[in-house]
């Protein structure tokens, strides 16, 4: 097993190379570029330059798509806008040499006032993913998309749903272990290993505050939480762990050091 640790975020384009150098000096080997509100790397040459530097430093890049996406919106225009945002990430990601574009799949449709239509939601999101993958193939972009496990119970993204999407579309996946804990109130590592048998895992991890309805906010990752995660991860996979806590750089370094001592 090999695990690469790193934070979410690379900062503005003008300082991105310096940021990567800083991550490298700390021993970090992964970084997720957070396009939280927009795809702010516009220029193909900028993307190639950042990607070249990351490759030189042995840092694996990934992308997080904008948060304002929903492949299950009732409105076709919003579904199309979601696909465009994800595809914009894929185009830039191709030039960056990024491995995956992580995204939040969408919200559940409702059958009635209080009942989610999980089956219809799955089929709509699946169709959106297939259309996105078709565009990726058409453009010959070397990147995959990774729907993320989600931390709120009213949002599509249980481990079962993400696993099924992966199996039926060939998309990748992002296992957010903080989200899984918030949603399920515990993490069943054996079940996760059985559902996700691929050799490459992309994961998020941080401390999290949650309630009855799931995720509330991220917090600093505790030493004991890192140990619990790392001792339960499979030993036969290549794994990237992106930390999203308020202190994500130091938390990533701490996770790396704990892993080195296991």
Q: What residues fall within each predicted segment?
A:
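N-terminal pre-domain/capping segments
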Residues: 1-65, 69-71, 76-88
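Acidic-and-aromatic substrate-binding clefts and catalytic sites of carbohydrate-active enzymes
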Residues: 10-16, 35-46, 71-74, 109-111, ...
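C-terminal helical cap(s) of enzyme catalytic domains, especially alpha/beta-barrels
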Residues: 249-262
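Active-site acidic/histidine proton-transfer and metal-coordination neighborhood
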Residues: 55-56, 72-175, 182
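Expand to "…catalyze enediolate/carbanion chemistry for C-C bond making/breaking, isomerization
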Residues: 15, 20, 83-86, 119-122, ...
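Gly/Pro-rich active-site loop or hairpin
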Residues: 159, 179-240, 246-247
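Hydrophobic faces of well-ordered beta-strands that scaffold small-molecule active sites
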Residues: 3-9, 31-33, 61-65, 101-103, ...
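Acidic (Asp/Glu)-rich catalytic clusters
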Residues: 20-27, 42-62, 88-97, 130-140, ...
């Amino acid at each position: 097993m090999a695990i690469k640790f790193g934070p979410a975020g690379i900062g503005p384009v003008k300082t991105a190379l310096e940021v990567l150098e800083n991550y490298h000096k700390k021993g970090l080997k992964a970084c997720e570029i957070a396009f939280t509100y927009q795809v702010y790397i516009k220029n193909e040459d900028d993307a190639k330059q950042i990607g070249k530097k990351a490759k030189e430093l042995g840092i694996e890049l990934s992308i997080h798509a904008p948060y304002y996406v929903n492949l299950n919106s009732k409105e076709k225009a919003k579904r199309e806008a979601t696909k465009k945002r994800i595809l914009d990430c894929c185009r830039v990601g191709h030039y960056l040499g990024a491995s995956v574009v992580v995204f939040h799949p969408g919200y559940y449709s409702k059958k009635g006032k209080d009942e989610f239509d999980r089956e219809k939601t799955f089929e709509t999101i699946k169709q959106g993913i297939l259309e996105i993958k078709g565009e990726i193939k058409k453009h010959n972009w070397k990147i995959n998309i990774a729907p993320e496990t989600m931390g709120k119970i009213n949002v599509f993204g249980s481990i079962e749903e993400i696993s099924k999407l992966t199996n039926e579309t060939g998309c990748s996946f992002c296992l957010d272990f903080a989200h899984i804990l918030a949603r399920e109130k515990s993490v069943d590592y054996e079940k996760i290993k059985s559902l996700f048998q691929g050799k490459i895992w992309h994961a998020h991890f941080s401390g999290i505050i949650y309630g009855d309805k799931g995720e509330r906010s991220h917090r600093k990752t505790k030493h004991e939480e890192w140990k619990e995660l790392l001792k339960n991860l499979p030993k036969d996979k290549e794994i990237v762990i992106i930390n999203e806590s308020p202190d994500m750089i130091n938390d990533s370094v701490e996770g790396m050091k704990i892993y080195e001592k296991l």
